[in-house]
């Protein structure tokens, strides 16, 4: 999600609450648009209320909000490199969702366009995209950012490794995560954020269809 990259670990949850406040309070939407948010420390947050294991419709890529799942990477990755912890957690949660949904993360998906301003696909047409896709696969936008998209192949491979591990009964700690080369950037220890928290507490908020907000990475499930 386009925004600051300078938040601390203690401030990370407030970034999620800020996204909710903007979506639900400022814009008048019923809930946060993303199904999941991941911070730069690798923490995974539940976004749209309803259960991560359920087919909850989000609102993250206008015209294609049905039959997919939206992951927000908190920060601006057009201007900064996503952390290793963030990349690993995106693959963790996407792989888990792919496994329980019967989706091949390395495959393709055909989605019907409902039409949206800035969409690459007119209303009524079909978009055939990777099963794990980005906002810019659907809309004319820089999102999810140049420093995210250069990791796309890596994330897809690690997502599939996670999905395959779940199907075979392995733990995520058994995985040997693959990294994309990062020129002039020192490598950090590979860590996976395993904490999953709800951004909405016990408040029940009904589902609605709302427009997309720039700055997401959308895992299409």
What do these predicted regions represent?
Residues 1, 6, 14, 33, ...:
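Basic/polar, cationic surfaces and motifs that engage anionic cell-wall
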Residues 30:
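Carboxylate/His-rich catalytic cores and anion/metal-binding grooves
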Residues 1-27:
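Cell wall/extracellular polymer interaction/catalysis modules
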